[in-house]
């Protein structure tokens, strides 16, 4: 096709090569003819006439219209995108216009004649279902010297993003901006300029015919400013939080002992606050559900949308299935542990860690028993639980059963004494009730046995004639230990009297045969101790052998009195009152395990322990064992019970002495027929 005048626009065969091929449809709108032509004809090309090629892709319709050129001017800025005009590979374009694209050198020489008017109206309507995008841009037209400045509005419409990417000989879609004057053509398309912010939508552009402040007209459009987010934790300074007791709300001081229940976040200042404060969960109904029927967890995915987060958020449902509820209930049951003192499988309230060994205690009573057995000193008042910062702070000290108890003031001491007296009175009253019940039962048995006497005497005819009347006088004291008979009773009556003596405890026991008093040497003690012997040893506390010339063994080692003392981690020294040395067997024994121990133990067996080389390690390991701690608790408990029983017996003896003055002698007279 021949060349036309410079004022017209010819579409030649080289146009697809210069502008690109097979990606976007454009409608070229003629601005006007500077040589007198009134308007350019409208050229329409059908979509169906252009459907040819190797891949069979569809091309869009191209419209060429005429519009009035704008009068305003602006710096030259063009779009950096790769716009490709659709064209069929086998058909030629028809028309009387040709697009002349000059080189960069020619544009630089004709800079004064180039129109400075450009309108950047880059509006993208992106749909989520992947439909077409429409991008409208306005480009300038470069004319020859002496001609008027022209503006060509190019309307580009892309079929889809996937179609433009599948075309060959076409660069990737780049929505950035570049200067047309500095652009180059390579293989029918613009030079590719990759920008790190090229994916950001440029819909928020500046108004028409207005220069962006602070940005050069020949530089790419500045990317949107990035927002800097700071966490609220960094913006606000951290404040030191006060730790308070969950029950009494008193602040905990530095160095104060705090108590915490297992599985709870609450802290307490004393065991009193810990026991009084209770948060028990409401019991849940247990649903028996098969694991196969348990619903599976579902995850909800939040799509990204317009958020700047790089990955979608995933979160699972918070509701658990009935099967999982039952599993959690089973775990809570399994969380129960066995108490070190009472051996009950229950919830644990106290945990004491001694030399990396944790001892679990279920109640305050067990904790106090453990503390008394191991000589633990508390830094708080025994009555109110007030914190005592130093040893000198607790001036009021009360010694009970060999243990020192600290109090914050004299009022707490008086309250504690009153509480002990009240408990002692309750114990005495219960013991009196038990003894009175036993005495009444013995009296009923005595009445019943006397009523049987007439029946027994009828069986003996010889005695009937001789004996007309039997008189039985019985003198009863508080313990009902003496029964006097004024007449000779038949053998059946004597048998009843023997039974009565057995019930009243007058029959000698087997324990009286075994000597109750034992030597202080544990090597001479029998293997099995009687109850009386054990009680005697607990009451009297066997002494430790001191100031003795301990013999040496074959290796030249011997026992030393330094083993009687234990040095704690904080430097304090405590006495091992349970360690006894046997002079007869030249070995050591554990008093607690010897009296209450079960099973095999070096410090419990008949020969004891005489490994002087490793004795220090053996003793430290033994006193931390669970068996030794349990036996020590049993020892201290029995000792306190024996003291209490002695007090009760002494009080009863005083009562008997008072009532003995007004004693009543009962005479029972039986008439035998």
From Swiss-Prot:
Q: Which InterPro entries match?
A: TRASH_dom (IPR011017), Znf_MYM (IPR010507), ZnF_MYMT-QRICH1 (IPR051284), Znf_TTF (IPR006580)
The function of this protein is: Functions as a transcriptional regulator.
Q: Name the major location.
A: nucleus
Keyword list (alphabetical) reads: Isopeptide bond, Metal-binding, Nucleus, Repeat, Transcription, Transcription regulation, Ubl conjugation, Zinc, Zinc-finger
Put simply, this protein is called Zinc finger MYM-type protein 5
Subcellular location as annotated: Nucleus
Polar residues bias: start-end ranges: 190-212
Pfam families from the entry?
Answer: zf-FCS (PF06467)
- Where would I find the Glycyl lysine isopeptide (Lys-Gly) (interchain with G-Cter in SUMO2) crosslink on this chain? 92, 167, 226, 456, 463, 552
- A GO BP annotation: negative regulation of transcription by RNA polymerase II
**Sequence intervals crossing the membrane:** none
Zn finger region (MYM-type)? 266-300, 312-352, 359-394, 405-432
The answer to whether the entry has keyword Transcription regulation is: yes
Q: Which organism is it from?
A: Bos taurus (Bovine)
Which SMART domains does the annotation name? Answer: TRASH (SM00746), ZnF_TTF (SM00597)
Naming one, the record's GO cellular component terms include: nucleus
One of the record's GO molecular function terms: zinc ion binding
Source domain of life is Eukaryota
Keyword Nucleotide-binding appears in the UniProt entry? no
């Amino acid at each position: 096709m021949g060349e036309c005048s410079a004022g017209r626009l010819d579409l030649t065969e080289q146009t697809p090569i210069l502008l690109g091929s097979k990606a976007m449809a454009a409608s070229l709108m003629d601005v006007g003819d500077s040589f007198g032509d009134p308007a350019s004809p409208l050229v329409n090309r059908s979509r169906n006439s252009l459907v040819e090629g190797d891949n069979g892709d569809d091309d869009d319709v191209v419209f060429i219209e005429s519009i009035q050129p704008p009068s305003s001017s602006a710096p030259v800025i063009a779009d950096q995108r790769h716009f490709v005009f659709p064209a069929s590979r086998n058909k030629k374009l028809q028309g009387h216009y040709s697009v002349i694209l000059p080189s960069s050198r020619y544009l630089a020489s004709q800079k004064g004649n180039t129109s400075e008017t450009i309108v950047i109206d880059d509006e993208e309507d992106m749909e989520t279902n992947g439909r077409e995008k429409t991008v409208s841009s306005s480009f300038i037209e470069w004319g020859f010297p002496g001609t008027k400045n022209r503006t060509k509005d190019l309307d580009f419409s892309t079929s889809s993003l996937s179609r433009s990417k599948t075309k060959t000989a076409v660069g990737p879609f780049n929505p950035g901006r570049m200067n047309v004057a500095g652009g180059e053509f390579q293989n029918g398309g613009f030079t590719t300029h990759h920008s790190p912010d090229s994916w950001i939508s440029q819909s928020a552009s500046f108004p028409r015919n207005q220069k962006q402040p602070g940005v050069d007209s020949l530089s790419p459009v500045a990317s949107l400013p990035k927002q800097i987010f700071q966490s609220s934790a960094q913006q606000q300074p951290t404040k030191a939080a006060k730790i308070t007791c969950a029950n009494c709300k008193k602040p905990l001081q530095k160095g104060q002992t705090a108590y915490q229940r297992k599985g709870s976040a609450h802290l307490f200042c004393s065991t009193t606050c810990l026991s009084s404060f209770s948060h028990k969960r409401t019991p849940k109904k247990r649903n028996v559900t098969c694991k196969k029927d348990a619903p599976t967890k579902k995850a909800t995915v939040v799509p990204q949308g317009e958020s700047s987060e790089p990955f979608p958020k995933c979160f699972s449902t918070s509701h658990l299935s009935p099967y999982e509820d039952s599993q959690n209930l089973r775990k809570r049951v399994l969380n129960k542990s066995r108490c070190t003192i009472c051996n009950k499988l229950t919830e644990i309230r106290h945990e004491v860690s001694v030399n990396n060994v944790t001892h679990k205690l279920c109640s305050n009573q067990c904790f106090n028993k453990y503390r008394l057995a191991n000589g633990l000193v508390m830094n708080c008042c025994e009555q109110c639980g007030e914190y005592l910062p130093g040893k000198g702070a607790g001036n009021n000290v009360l010694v009970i059963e060999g243990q020192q108890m600290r109090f914050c003031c004299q009022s707490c001491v008086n309250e504690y004494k009153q509480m002990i007296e009240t408990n002692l009175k309750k114990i005495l009253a219960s013991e009196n009730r038990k003894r009175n019940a036993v005495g009444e039962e013995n009296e009923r048995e005595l009445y019943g046995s006397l009523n049987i006497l007439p029946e027994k005497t009828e069986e003996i005819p010889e005695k009937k004639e001789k004996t007309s009347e039997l008189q039985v006088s019985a003198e009863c004291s508080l313990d009902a230990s003496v029964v006097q008979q004024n007449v000779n009773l038949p053998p059946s009556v004597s048998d009843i009297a023997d039974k009565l003596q057995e019930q009243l405890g007058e029959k000698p026991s087997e324990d009286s045969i075994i000597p109750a008093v034992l030597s202080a040497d544990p090597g001479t003690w029998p293997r099995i101790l009687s109850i009386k012997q054990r009680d005697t040893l607990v009451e009297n506390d066997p002494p430790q052998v001191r100031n003795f010339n301990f013999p040496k063994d074959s290796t030249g080692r011997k026992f030393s009195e330094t083993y009687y003392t234990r040095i704690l981690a904080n430097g304090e020294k405590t006495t091992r009152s349970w360690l006894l040395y046997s002079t007869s067997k030249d070995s050591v024994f554990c008093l607690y395990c010897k009296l209450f121990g079960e099973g095999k133990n070096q410090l419990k067996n008949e020969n004891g322990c005489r490994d002087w080389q490793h004795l220090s390690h053996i003793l430290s390991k033994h006193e931390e064992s669970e068996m030794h701690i349990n036996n020590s608790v049993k020892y201290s408990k029995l000792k306190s019970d024996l003291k209490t029983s002695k007090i009760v017996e002494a009080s009863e003896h005083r009562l008997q002495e008072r009532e003995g003055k007004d004693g009543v002698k009962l005479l029972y007279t039986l008439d035998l027929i």
